[in-house]
Amino acid sequence: MNELVQILKNTRQHLMTGVSHMIPFVVSGGILLAVSVMLYGKGAVPDAVADPNLKKLFDIGVAGLTLMVPFLAAYIGYSIAERSALAPCAIGAWVGNSFGAGFFGALIAGIIGGIVVHYLKKIPVHKVLRSVMPIFIIPIVGTLITAGIMMWGLGEPVGALTNSLTQWLQGMQQGSIVMLAVIMGLMLAFDMGGPVNKVAYAFMLICVAQGVYTVVAIAAVGICIPPLGMGLATLIGRKNFSAEERETGKAALVMGCVGVTEGAIPFAAADPLRVIPSIMVGSVCGAVTAALVGAQCYAGWGGLIVLPVVEGKLGYIAAVAVGAVVTAVCVNVLKSLARKNGSSTDEKEDDLDLDFEIN
C-alpha cells in the first residue's frame, strides 16, 4: 500500500514524463495537418481526387495526432514501471481512444497500466522464468488487465466525459472564453514552464485533440509572451537592466519567438516581485486579445513559429504584441519605481549621517 501511495504522490512527475515525450507528435502532426489544410485553400480536408498529395500530407498529420494518445500513456507507464509498462499502457490508451476517451483516456490508461505492471514485477517467480517475465509474461498480462479495464469498464464513460468537455468548449460564449483566457494566461506565465504552466499546456493539448483551435491560440499566445515581453523590456528600458540581463534579453526574444516560456526564468529569478506579476498581466492581456479577435492555431505549440498554421494571423500577431508591450511597460515601471525608492532611501540615510556628524 505504501508503494501505491508513493506512486500516486508522484503522479505529476509521471504525467510530465508522458507529456514531454508526447510533444513531438503533437507539434509535427498538428503542423503537417494544418499546412495541408492551409495549402488546399478551402478551409477543409483536402480532397483525395482533387489534390492527392495534400490529402496524403493531411493523413500524415492525422497519424501524428493519433499516435500522441498511446505514446502519452506509454511514457506515463514507463515513468512508473519502466520498459515493461510501455505496451500495456499504449494498447490500453488505444482501446480507450476507440471510445473517444482521447487525452483523458491516455492519462487513466497510463496510470493504471503503470501500477498494474509495477505490481506484476513484484510477483516472486522461479529463476528460470525471470528472464521471460519482462518481455513475455508481464506485457501480456499487463495488456490484458489494462486494455480490459478500458474496454469493459472506463473507456465508454471517459469517452462520454471527453465528448461533453468538447461540446462545452465549442459552445462557449465570448464572456466564458475571455474568463478562460484570463485563467490560462495566469497559469502559463506564473511559473514559466513549471507544474502550473504544464497543467495549462496539457489543457491546450486536449483542445488540439478535440479540435477546439480558438483555445489553442489563446494558449499559444500566452506561452510566448513572458520571454518576448522581458526581451522587449531590456530594449526599451536599458537602464533598468544590467549588461548581462540585456544580453539575456536578446536570447529571450528568440526563445519567445519559438514558444519557449522558460526564456523569462533568468529575469524572474533575479527580481521575482516585479517580473512575475508583470509577465502574468502581460500574458492575460495577450490571451484575452487572442480570444476577442477569434484567432485559431492548429498546432500544439506557441510563439511566432506557428504563425504559418494560424488562422487570423493579424489578430494573433496583435495579441502577442499587446501582451509583450504590456509586460515590458509593467516591468520597467516597477523597476523604475524601485530605483527611485532606493535612491530616496539612500539620500535620507546620507542626510541622517550628515546630521549625526554635525551634531
Swiss-Prot record:
Gene that produces this protein: frwC
Record has Isomerase as a keyword: no
Molecular function terms from GO: carbohydrate:proton symporter activity; protein-N(PI)-phosphohistidine-sugar phosphotransferase activity; protein-phosphocysteine-sugar phosphotransferase activity
Role: The phosphoenolpyruvate-dependent sugar phosphotransferase system (PTS), a major carbohydrate active -transport system, catalyzes the phosphorylation of incoming sugar substrates concomitant with their translocation across the cell membrane.
GO CC entries: plasma membrane; transmembrane transporter complex
Full protein name: Fructose-like permease IIC component 2
Domain PTS EIIC type-2 span(s) in chain numbering: 11-344
Membrane topology: Multi-pass membrane protein
The organism's taxonomic lineage, starting at the top: Bacteria, Pseudomonadati, Pseudomonadota, Gammaproteobacteria, Enterobacterales
Comment, domains: The EIIC domain forms the PTS system translocation channel and contains the specific substrate-binding site.
Stretches that traverse the bilayer: 19-39, 60-80, 99-119, 135-155, 176-196, 216-236, 251-271, 290-310, 314-334
